[in-house]
Amino acid sequence: MSIFIFISLVLGLAHQHKRSSIIVRLYSKDGFQKCSLTIRAVSAYALACKLQLEHRPLRAQRLRQIRLAQKSRVFPFIFYQCPHKKKSARIHALTFTKEAELSKLSIETLRCIHLQLISCTRSPVVTNSSY
């Protein structure tokens, strides 16, 4: 699963449930929770564009679509946030009322997502437990 598809899935869930933030829990094949991320959607398309630019070059038509999307604010900007401590994790989780669980992802997929999140965000992504 590419990071862009992953983002699209989460945004779809956030939009469907009319939430600005969504908690995603990632699991290894044996069912143990490996990572909990909060993905916050606000108005802009910058990070999604950055992620897509890192994967493949964009054609002129796609760039025009992105500029139009930025003007209309149709597409959300993704801000990844993970609490640094277990205490703050509980407080943080209480802020949001809807959770989406994308379970049974392979550990390789999880590592790939985690590494790409780190490389694409300014603030570090902290997981709740080690691999």
Swiss-Prot record:
Residues listed as glycosylation sites in the UniProt record = 128
Q: Where do the TM regions start and end? A: none
User: Which positions carry the signal peptide feature in this UniProt record?
Assistant: 1-16
Q: Would the keyword Aminoacyl-tRNA synthetase be found if you checked this record's keyword annotation? A: no
Any idea which UniProt keywords this protein has? Answer: Glycoprotein, Host nucleus, Secreted, Signal, Virulence
Q: What is its main location?
A: secreted
The short motif RxLR is annotated over 56-59
GO CC terms: extracellular region; host cell nucleus
Q: Where in the cell is it found?
A: Secreted; Host nucleus
The keyword Secreted appears for this protein: yes
Q: What biological function has been recorded for the protein in this entry? A: Secreted effector that completely suppresses the host cell death induced by cell death-inducing proteins.
Task: Fill in the domain comment.
Answer: Has the canonical translocation RxLR motif, but lacks the canonical EER motif, which characterizes most oomycete effectors identified so far.
- What family classification does the UniProt entry report for this protein? Belongs to the RxLR effector family.
Q: What is this protein called?
A: Secreted RxLR effector protein 45
